[in-house]
Every structure is written in structure tokens, then in C-alpha cells.
């Protein structure tokens, strides 16, 4: 299991945020509240556009 952080773009408001690709809780957009990722017991169900995989968070 290789866990990573990903930068995603919300399909509703186009806000970009960095999330964990194996979430243990529902992840919502911090601007509009739309669900962008759901837990599945492993790799999450990402419901937003994945822009890039992040190696380091600045």
C-alpha cells in the first residue's frame, strides 16, 4: 500500500486543494463543501479531478 498526497480540483468551484489519497473520513472542498473524496477501506474514491501527485507539501 503506497499512500500519497494528491492535488485535486473541485468540479463545482474549481478550488484546488491537497488531500490524502487513502482518506479515513469523507473529504469536502473547503470552499463550497462538495465531497471530493470518500473512504473505501483502501485507496479512496476521489470524486474530483486529480491535478498532480505531491511529493512534498510546501
Swiss-Prot record:
Coiled-coil features, chain-numbered ranges: none
Disulfide pairings: none
Key words of the record: Metal-binding, Ribonucleoprotein, Ribosomal protein, Zinc, Zinc-finger
GO molecular function: structural constituent of ribosome; zinc ion binding
Pfam families for the chain: Ribosomal_S27e
Any one of the GO BP annotations: translation
Residue intervals of every C4-type zinc finger in the record: 10-32
Binding site for Zn(2+): 10, 13, 29, 32
Cofactor: Zn(2+)
Entry GO CC: ribonucleoprotein complex; ribosome
Subunit organization: Part of the 30S ribosomal subunit.
Protein's recorded name: Small ribosomal subunit protein eS27
The species this protein was found in: Archaeoglobus fulgidus (strain ATCC 49558 / DSM 4304 / JCM 9628 / NBRC 100126 / VC-16)
Amino acid at each position: 500500500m503506497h499512500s500519497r498526497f494528491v492535488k485535486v480540483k473541485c468540479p463545482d468551484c474549481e478550488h484546488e486543494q491537497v488531500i490524502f489519497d487513502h482518506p479515513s473520513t469523507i473529504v469536502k472542498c473547503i470552499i463550497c463543501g462538495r465531497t471530493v473524496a470518500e473512504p473505501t477501506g483502501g485507496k479512496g474514491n476521489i470524486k474530483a479531478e486529480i491535478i498532480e501527485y505531491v511529493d512534498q507539501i510546501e
